[in-house]
A protein has these predicted regions:
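Beta-rich carbohydrate-recognition and catalytic domains
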Residues: 1-40, 44-149
Length: 149
């Protein structure tokens, strides 16, 4: 399959911004796994630490997981898993004392950042999701739209 060809050593780096538009690269590797491409991570701050989720390109349903107290130095933890087929490509956010992970066409929630329960989702690929102050959710994603006639 296409993921069999994923080779290399892509690593997680970081950048900071004061305005969300202009970013400055922060020197240093935040997280790496030897002989694994780590791409498209999702990070979230929850219960006093940072949680980092990275798609495992070779194993659907499994994601690499690391945590950090300072958001700069991540330590690998046990991989996270969901019960159905899905890729840990997406967005993590916190609401109602849980982390919600909105993955590519799936969603999962966790009370502790380690144990996950999957939920039905109708979102498209790689969504960005935020929980709003009025207790509603805003999701931005894309879908191919056939030409309009």
């Amino acid at each position: 399959g296409p993921h069999d060809k994923v080779l290399g050593d892509a690593q997680i780096h970081s950048a900071i911004s004061n305005d969300g538009i202009n970013f400055t690269y922060e020197p240093g590797i935040r997280f790496a796994i030897s002989d694994r491409d780590l791409r498209d991570p999702a990070a979230v701050y929850f219960k006093g630490k940072w949680h980092l989720y990275i798609p495992n390109q070779r194993n659907d349903g499994t994601g690499y997981y690391a945590s950090s107290l300072d958001g700069l130095n991540f330590v690998r933890q046990n991989n996270v898993k969901i019960s159905n087929k899905g890729n840990w490509l997406g967005n993590a956010t916190v609401a109602k004392s849980k982390i919600s992970f909105f993955g590519t066409v799936w969603r999962a929630t966790s009370p502790n950042g380690i144990d996950w329960k999957t939920n039905r989702s109708t979102l498209g690929p790689d969504p960005a999701v935020v929980h709003l102050r009025n207790d509603s959710w805003l999701a931005v994603t894309f879908r191919k739209i056939e030409s309009i006639k």
